[in-house]
A protein has these predicted regions:
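Active-site ExK catalytic segment of metal-dependent nucleases
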Residues: 58-64
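Short amphipathic alpha-helix that is part of the acyltransferase structural core
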Residues: 1-56
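A structural microfeature
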Residues: 56-57, 205
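Acyl-donor binding region in acyl/amide transferases
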Residues: 64-201, 207-215
Length: 215
């Protein structure tokens, strides 16, 4: 397969991205998934060149150069970003990343990452962050994943994000940390999160339960 990446050039492109997000996140073609941050972001769309240029992936990036911009980030709605406010370098928030469930080609994420890398280099970005979603709100379903993350990938204290959302599950509540199935944990990790971890990323010490998106 071959993919073509496009940066949204107008409101129609952004609307197309929002409708795709709605289909993936909300399982609806009638609701437009949008928020106030959309107008501040750069939007990317990826198309399948050999399938009539079908839209298969969208995501958005938000460039952050000061504390006020950080406070306007999507992550700030759900996490206390006190530690990130101490970072003086330019940052980038990656968000609303979604892929057509019928496409499991790793080339899609690689295509996206190529664009992100160029943006990072151009803007001298030193820190990337964003939310990655587990499908559904069942904690039990992902206990192996959470134990795996707790044992290997919790962010250093200087980057830790504090609880802000009303409904969360804290990894400190996990018991028998060494009793989990590694194969199952890796299988159930969101592909995008796995990609971040392979690049050296970390996770917070809790997950947010979002009943709006059912994640």
């Amino acid at each position: 397969m071959s993919y073509v990446l496009k940066t949204a050039e107008n409101s129609n492109d952004i609307k197309l991205s929002q409708l795709f997000r709605s289909k993936i996140f909300r399982k609806s073609k009638n609701i437009c998934d949008n928020d106030e941050l959309d107008q501040r972001c750069i939007h990317y769309l990826i198309f399948d060149k050999f399938n009539s240029y079908k839209l298969v992936c969208v995501f958005r990036v938000y460039l952050i150069h000061n504390t006020n911009q950080l406070c306007n980030s999507y992550s700030n709605k759900f996490y206390k970003l006190n530690n990130l406010k101490k970072i003086q370098d330019p940052m980038l928030e990656l968000g609303r990343f979604c892929v057509d469930p019928n496409y499991r080609d790793p080339k899609i994420i690689m295509t996206a990452w190529s664009a992100i890398r160029k943006l990072v280099e151009k803007n001298k970005i030193k820190f990337l962050f964003g939310c990655s979603s587990f499908i559904g709100t069942s904690i039990d379903r992902y206990l192996d994943c959470f134990k795996f993350l707790k044992t290997k990938y919790i962010a250093p204290k200087k980057y830790n994000l504090y609880v802000k959302a009303p409904k969360v599950f804290k990894f400190n509540n996990l018991i028998n940390l060494n009793n989990f199935c590694l194969k199952k944990a890796k299988k159930n990790l969101p592909p995008l999160l796995s990609f971040y971890l392979n690049l050296g990323g970390w996770v917070s010490d809790h997950v947010v339960i979002d009943n709006d998106l059912e994640t």
